[in-house]
Curated annotation (Swiss-Prot):
GO biological process: cobalamin biosynthetic process
Domain GATase cobBQ-type: 252-440
CDD domains: GATase1_CobQ
Keyword list, A-Z: Cobalamin biosynthesis, Glutamine amidotransferase
Active site positions: C334, H432
Protein name per UniProt: Cobyric acid synthase
Similarity field: Belongs to the CobB/CobQ family. CobQ subfamily.
Molecular function GO labels: ABC-type vitamin B12 transporter activity; catalytic activity
Stated role: Catalyzes amidations at positions B, D, E, and G on adenosylcobyrinic A,C-diamide. NH(2) groups are provided by glutamine, and one molecule of ATP is hydrogenolyzed for each amidation.
Gene symbol of the encoding locus: cobQ
Amino acid sequence: MTRALMIQGTGSDVGKSLLVAGLARAFTRRGLRVRPFKPQNMSNNAAVTADGGEIGRAQALQARAARVAPSVHMNPVLLKPQSEVGAQVVVQGRMIGTARARDYQAWKPRLMESVLDSFERLRADSDLVLVEGAGSPAEVNLRRGDIANMGFARATDTPVVIVGDIDRGGVIASLVGTQAVMEPDDAAMIRGFIVNRFRGDPTLFADGMALIAERTGWTPFGLVPFFPEAGRLPPEDAVALDVAGAGRDGSVPLIAVLRFPHIANFDDLDPLRQEPGVSVAFVPAGEPIPAEADLIVLPGSKTTIDDLDFLRAQGWDIDIRAHLRRGRRVLGLCGGYQMLGRAIADPQGIEGAPRALPGLGLLDVETVMTAEKRLVAVTGTTLADDEPFSGYEMHVGDTTGPDAAHPLLRFADGRADGAVSADGLVAGTYVHGLFANDRQRAAWLARLGAAPGLTNYEAGIEAVLDRFADHLEAHLDCDGLLRLCRPL
């Protein structure tokens, strides 16, 4: 009989996604058929499913932890921010429109139908559904029509365990305060709590755990010590980049990644961040691109035209041209590839108001935004060295021009992708996930004069998931969590 458990948090980035992934691996190893589920996610870091849909990257990692293929039903509502007040709305893998934050509230009753439909589909094919909430149930101003936290928990009668992050401080106030602001019927859905990311001697917080339990009446399910290897797993939230780009090692080649306001699919760079032979720095607003950079990467973007305007406002276009005069390399990924061309046109207003503007002019190609979004897994080889790759496309827009006659990649179905400049210093591609391929990554490192030190990226992810599952089994009452799960 299928059971379900919902993991909510006192706020964003308290570790909900990773805890669900670790529990998914732990319970899968016990022989259970586990399915991850997040009713509503907000992220521009998405993954492509086998049926050509898209879901949040965190749910794809959780599916991997559960050793099942990602499904659009694991994240039935995905919001992809395009501005400070609006987002694309993806339902069961397909974009259905764009909504402003205020207008989105009116969509929720209809979206709840899709959420419950997807949940039932997963329930029918599993022993345990691990549900992840979004943000915090303490955001009571958003409670009416909620589909992400208590609205879902109440609709399905799914028990909730809430997570607090002690590493950021104030965990007692966060947990006790969450209960204090909630309606009694919502608060009653929370059966226990987890304190995450503890550093030091856990016995020193025993009184804190007891105090939280006494004040709330919740069962303590464990104090999870900080897990340093979590940084080796692909991040979903761009907030992780604020930490990721902090350090530079002047003794190895430097890869500078432009930190666009609407950066998307930035996990493309995660395998490079783990390579000891290079240093990866995300360049924030207001800072010049380091002159010592060996490679500049223009990453994916949810709003390419706006982020191109932003790039110019930072003076990065000037830095890029100076970089090329020094004989260094530039790589554009997806939206970054579009920026490298002569022009970008959006006549249908796919990204906002219809407009067109000049590109950087570093590749002899032009892009026209199109209504149809391409979502597909791809395989093939690079034209330069015939090295194999696998990855995925996730973009709107067609890019054509003379430099496209000199593509970077050739797909297995014969199609070409990307473009390379005549001098070979500038390249662009629509393919995401290129650097997760060990031989592709090694080839790019060789071009920078660096030796690969990470021999098998994918095997490394698997090993970290197993070690994190071990970590949770050692520090959480996993048997108690299973007993809490109600049969559906």
